[in-house]
């Protein structure tokens, strides 16, 4: 919602976790992992395929310069760090280099020791960015702030914030582990036993109850904040700084950065080469590494709001970190110690099933005649990955006992509506979908309007709500897009509609829905199952 406002899973299962593909938000185009055209040149003799966190998209001007000067194509694939870690565990890694947000994802995923020449390109802490006037009223301006200080303001109803999913994005994961560490009293290391502490569980649930919008991407969280009306967000310092630059241009109130002193986590942006025996690619990678690590380019990277050493900021770049925004440039960063991989996965499993704010999701699914055959079978297969809990657990998308799920199946009318509370009855929804056969037209807006009515029956403040629409065609019911926009706004708005496009879906209309509701469009043509996983990762 917008405002100014289980037990331990097996390590083997969780190592298959799939996070969301990450890319910049295009209003009228489905999300993909495509790269900037300035980086790819078919005439260049060597192409490096790089799996990268979305936060590195801001550095594309530097990468484009390198590509042009060295005649090396850079094919950037923006993905979640957990997804990059998973790819490193494959027998054939589909990339020449990886650039996740944190070294821990290489350490966890690279069991075959394929990655070499790893270098930390920059570092950035994960911080709170809070509207300056609110931060001042909370007493945070100019103060040392602890995680418990923040928890107190959430419990008093004074603070809500946006944050990426801990199971889908490194910034969310890092912040979450920092919260756990601080709430446990800054132990030497987080253990499996400490995660079962009743006091910790109560506190972390209370803290995460303050999340009013979730995201699967750190870069898109910035976009969401700029387009919406929110009090605060947890994100990389570099993205808070670039958000403030945009807010400054728009004449809007900036965010004040708060660095929780007892739960600070750091992204170290490691770039590593995946050794698959190609000498030309290895040579090209080393040129890229040397370029990024050169003194000149490191200074340029600082101008993007990224620190290039734990010792602080170069004097000529101090203006990027404005004191009025709460930037701490003279303080030595003291990050928390991350838990070992098994405890990390257990913590993420608990986040998904017990700790995070429960999801409230309405799946609005197209069963019109054009979905006959392969399309409907793909849809059923995709929903199996979300609703059948053993499969969902492999992707860290399993349901919690307090979440609510609805399905609305439509063609030329709303054919079926069904609800399921918790993480057991949810599988009954899949069986209903499995029995459905496509026929008829596409009354898409009527179905979406019905979903809004269904969700209005819930106390939305207790959930992270979302509508996930899947369609393969043009709406041809009695309600048109403008009719739906009026209805959406009259009902208060605030519920994002994430669309999955398939076949002949009307991308312009889906893009307008995304813009209206501060959501995204995902491309289901390449892989419908993966598109549903991505969309679900946003709530």
Regions found by a protein language model. Name each.
Residues 435, 471-523, 533-535:
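VWA/integrin I-like adhesion module and closely mimicked acidic/polar interface patches used
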